UniProtKB/Swiss-Prot annotation:
Catalyzes the reversible transfer of the terminal phosphate of ATP to form a long-chain polyphosphate (polyP). It comes from Neisseria meningitidis serogroup B (strain ATCC BAA-335 / MC58). Mg(2+) binds at residues 375, 405. Its cofactor is Mg(2+). This is Polyphosphate kinase. It catalyses: [phosphate](n) + ATP = [phosphate](n+1) + ADP. One of its GO terms (cellular component) is polyphosphate kinase complex.
Length: 685
């Protein structure tokens, strides 16, 4: 196969993942309001796609237009391919919302009322709502030499209003801009009595369209057109000019709201001359214009399921399983000292991790606590426990990653609070994101210091721990806990990388470990021995790993990859990858765990990791891979993390050589296997 065809386009692969998410919104087996949520997830993902990936392609085209990307194409060619795929996905999304979801919701008494369908009583209520809630806070900006075109915030809802007449100062009118503040809901619930006892919603854009004339008394409104600008959201911090990383991040967060435009969304009814006017204002081309049949921001519909009390239209509630042994002992440290604990979230509760930190804060025998924070949410019992530990006089060190995309402001806030509580807060190593998920507790026991560590595949975030699937290990293993201590010393101090006993770390040893393990399986296959690699991750795009997997496949290694999102490897290509199979599982839970398995002539080497197989994870982040050696825990990771995922024939998608996906289905006579439901049955409370 030609060199340029061995690697698929990562952006097209990411859009293909979102097509699989959209399939959840189409699936009649998914509860109706959850289908609406999946529709919103696609919109949110697309926003980030344009803010990050499309923005990167545009920058790359400007910087080096002739350079070929990993997929063998130049940036301009890739932009054209990606734009076509994005348009197709967005059209499909709006068709689904308008022609399928809205009618089905209406049958359940959940209505989105358009202006043409408002009853007189609804019109009266909506006008009162506008006068009471909107009119006092809206600020129209008329465009003239003293009022230049305003800079809309990233992803904000705006309206271009065409006017006729002269204002109070005798100025001829032409156009004004109205910006809808973000504090306003994008969908407004109507009183039940106005909706026949059901649930009714109106779009904020419809309310503004109906009453925008009140912002321009005495003027004639000729047209009102919603638009939304998506901007490049990359944060750039110059190391040479850097004095204070936290202050620099705070400044960049403000600037990000006004980055270069990458996408303009308008309704499909917007006239051509308005579209051209807006494109000119934002220095965009027609290729960057997206006309949609409906509201320009479907993301904000995610409020609707929470406003509708219909359990029959939502997923059933699951209760995470709890460690029975934890209730029988006074201390989690006593339990871990006996044997390590493996947690599989969300099927098993995240509470033991929280309890470990709470106990560390209150236990007089605990001398020091260390933890990394990448994403943790706006409310975190874990961070509160760290603050309590610091206030209690313990040595608390927290590595806060300020560059966690779209969580920067939240992490800056936590860093301030932790410092005020007396914790030592460091921001990692400039140029390397700290993505490793690790915590360390140092305790004095019988006159000697004893370490306890938690290492996970997911964030210290109680909210996502109920949605994302992840593994976590709590251990007192002396070599592993010593390794974790070395990693914290590397991050917070200065010096050469320490020699680790069991852990592997990026950017120093993890990539080499993966390449070496693949090569070892390759040699075993050449020698006629059984050889197998099974791995689960979010993304696989690192070219040298892909080439190593191709070599392994050619040697006869059987390779099964469970890749939820981007995968730029081509599976099943004769002479290249016929022994590689790739599947993606998309369901209620977000598959997030990273698990690596290498047969190794029967030793079954198994790791849990924070790292996907991407260049950034191997070379530009601080990551960990932890071996699972305890026989029972290894058996669980292989079975729950890999085997059950390979058996799934309900939510699995099978990747094809061209990068497309086909949904798996039970073979004739085969029973259904549903990874996530089966894990709830196996592990849930």
């Amino acid at each position: 196969m030609p060199e340029q065809n061995r690697i698929l386009c990562r952006e097209l692969s990411l859009l293909a993942f979102n097509r699989r998410v959209l399939a959840q919104a189409e699936d009649q087996n998914v509860p109706l309001l959850e289908r609406l949520r999946f529709l919103c997830i696609v919109s949110s993902n697309l926003d980030e796609f344009f803010e990050v990936r499309m923005a990167w392609l545009k920058r790359e085209h400007k910087r080096c237009p002739q350079r070929r990307l990993d997929n063998g194409k130049m940036p301009s060619e890739t932009i054209a391919d990606v734009t076509e795929a994005a348009r197709s996905l967005i059209r499909h999304q709006y068709d689904l919302f308008n022609n399928v979801l809205q009618p089905e919701l209406a049958q359940e008494g959940i209505h989105f009322y358009r202006r043409r369908n408002w009853t007189d009583t609804q019109k009266k209520w909506i006008e009162d709502y506008f006068d009471r809630e909107l009119l006092p806070i809206l600020t129209p900006i008329g465009l003239d030499p003293s009022h230049p075109f305003p800079r809309p915030l990233n992803k904000s809802l705006n309206f271009a209003v065409e006017l006729d007449g002269t204002d109070a100062f005798g100025r001829p009118s032409g156009m004004a801009i109205v910006q809808a503040p973000r504090i306003l809901p994008r969908v407004v619930p109507l009183p039940s009595e106005l909706c026949g006892g059901g649930h009714g919603f109106v779009f904020l854009s419809s309310i503004l369209h109906a009453h925008v004339g009140k912002l321009f008394p005495g003027m004639n409104v000729k047209g009102c057109h919603q638009f939304r600008l998506t901007r490049d959201s990359d944060l750039t911090v110059d190391e040479e000019d850097l004095q204070n990383l936290r202050a620099a991040i705070q400044n960049e967060l403000h600037d990000r709201e006004y980055g270069d435009g990458v996408r303009l969304e308008v309704a499909d009814t917007c006239p051509a001359y308005i579209r051209d006017f807006l494109l000119a204002q934002f220095k965009l081309t027609a290729a960057e214009l997206y006309q949609v049949k409906g509201p320009v921001n479907l993301v904000r519909l995610n409020a609707v399921p929470d406003l509708v009390n219909r359990p029959d239209l939502k997923f059933p509630t699951h209760t995470p399983g709890r460690l029975k042994a934890l209730g029988k002992t006074a201390s989690i440290f006593d339990l871990v000292r006996q044997s390590p604990i493996l947690l599989h979230h969300p099927y098993q509760s995240f509470d033991p991790v929280v309890e470990m930190m709470r106990e560390a804060a209150a236990d007089p025998a605990v001398l020091a606590v260390k933890m990394t924070i990448y994403r943790t949410g706006t409310r975190s019992e874990l961070v509160r426990a760290l603050m309590k530990a610091a206030l209690a006089g313990k040595q608390v060190t927290v590595v806060v990653e300020l560059m966690a995309r779209f969580d920067e402001a939240n992490n800056v806030n936590w860093a301030k609070q932790l410092e005020e509580a007396g914790a030592h807060v460091v921001y990692g190593v400039f140029g390397y994101k700290v993505h490793a998920k690790m915590a360390l507790v140092i305790r004095r026991e019988d006159g000697v210091l004893k370490r306890y560590a938690h290492l996970g595949t997911g964030n210290y975030h109680q909210g996502t721990s109920r949605i994302y699937t992840d593994f976590g290990l709590i251990t007192a293993d002396e070599q592993i806990t010593a390794d974790v201590n070395i990693l914290f010393m590397e991050i917070t101090g200065l010096g050469k990388p320490g020699r680790l006993n069991k852990l592997y770390q990026s950017p120093f040893t993890l990539h080499k470990m993966v390449i070496d393990r693949i090569a070892r399986e390759t040699e075993h296959a050449k020698a006629g021995k059984p050889a197998r690699i099974t791995a689960k991750m979010n993304s696989l795009i690192e070219p040298t790993v892909i080439e190593a997997l191709y070599r392994a496949s050619a040697a006869g290694v059987q390779i099964d990859l469970i890749v939820r999102g981007m995968c730029t490897l081509r599976p099943g290509v004769k002479g290249l990858s016929e022994n590689i199979r790739v599947r993606s599982i998309v369901g209620r839970q977000l598959e997030h765990a990273r698990v690596y398995y290498f047969h190794n002539n029967g030793t079954d080497d198994t790791f849990i990791s924070s790292a996907d197989w991407m260049g950034r994870n191997f070379f530009r982040r601080i990551e960990t891979a932890t071996p699972i050696t305890a026989p029972e825990l290894k058996k669980r990771v292989i079975h729950e993390g890999l085997t059950m995922a390979l058996d799934d024939n309900t939510h699995a998608w099978l990747m094809q050589p061209d990068g497309g996906y086909i949904r798996a289905a039970p073979a004739e006579g085969e029973s259904e296997a549903d990874l996530q439901n089966d894990l709830w049955t196996l592990l849930g409370g």
